[in-house]
Structures are given as structure tokens and as C-alpha cells.
Regions:
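Charged, low-complexity intrinsically disordered regions
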Residues: 90-147
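Polyanion-binding interface signature
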Residues: 2-106
């Protein structure tokens, strides 16, 4: 498909799952994923409250890629503090990543990509960025779980 070929949300997120399985190291390919309402996909490695998310903000024309902390207030604060302490390491691999408190006591470590519409070009960019986020952040998240 050409770069400008428009994709329905279902096609886009199905394609993103397939691309991630192809791009991720073998040890990170066995994620659980679910579509959220609208233009949203979440994936995780056994803790759904700490999940990676791809979310198309249609009004802003942006696609958010990131790691969301949506557990208890205590868990979210622990995760926020842990990743704040690792931001130099994170920024070395994900230079546009931002860590911020968010809605309902949640927080997120994310960036946005231009996405006026969902097409093959956005899918390619999203797959690269999301694979980078997972490969960079999941080992850190695994360390957080051990502490």
C-alpha cells in the first residue's frame, strides 16, 4: 500500500499489532492487547494497569504513543518517581518522551506523532516508535516490579 492509503481504525490497529510482533525482540512479542473505545489500542505484559497505548487524537491530528500508569494512586506515584529517576536513560533512546501526571491520578510517559488521518505512513511511524518505547521501557518496568 502507498504511504497515503487511508486505513479504517480497525485496519490501522490490527496492522500496528502485526508490525509490533515483527519489530520487537522475541522476548517482547507475547503481549496482550485490546482495542479501547474509538481510536485506541492498549497492550501490556501481565499488568493491564501499566500499559502501552496508541491513541489517535482526531481533533489535534496527533497519534499518542506511550506508557500509561493507570493503577492505584500509590502504584502510579511509585511508577512516576521510578521513571523520573531514569529519564536520562529514557531520553537517550526516546528523545521526545515526556513524563507527566495526567487525568484521574494517572500518569504517562509519551510523545505524539503527526497524524491528521490514519494511513500507511502513520502506521509505519507508529510501529517504529511504539517498538522503541516497548524495547526501552519494558526492561525498566520489569525492574520496577521487582523493587
Amino acid at each position: 500500500l502507498a504511504s497515503g492509503t487511508l486505513l479504517a481504525p480497525g485496519e490501522f490497529f490490527s496492522g500496528l499489532r502485526k508490525e509490533l510482533k515483527a519489530r520487537l525482540p522475541a522476548a517482547l512479542r507475547s503481549f496482550s492487547s485490546a482495542r479501547g473505545r474509538g481510536r485506541l489500542m492498549k497492550l501490556h505484559y501481565g499488568r493491564p494497569e501499566f500499559h502501552y497505548e496508541a491513541w489517535h487524537h482526531t481533533g489535534a491530528g496527533r497519534l499518542e504513543i506511550g506508557l500509561h500508569f493507570e493503577g492505584s494512586a500509590v502504584e502510579n506515584q511509585e511508577a512516576f518517581d521510578f521513571f523520573r529517576g531514569h529519564m536520562l536513560e529514557v531520553k537517550a533512546r526516546l528523545p521526545r518522551a515526556e513524563l507527566e501526571p495526567w487525568d484521574r491520578g494517572w500518569s504517562r510517559l509519551y510523545e505524539t506523532l503527526p497524524a491528521p488521518q490514519l494511513d500507511e505512513g502513520v502506521l509505519d511511524d507508529a510501529a517504529v516508535r511504539m517498538a522503541d518505547y516497548i524495547a526501552t521501557l519494558q526492561p525498566l518496568l520489569d525492574n520496577l516490579k521487582k523493587e
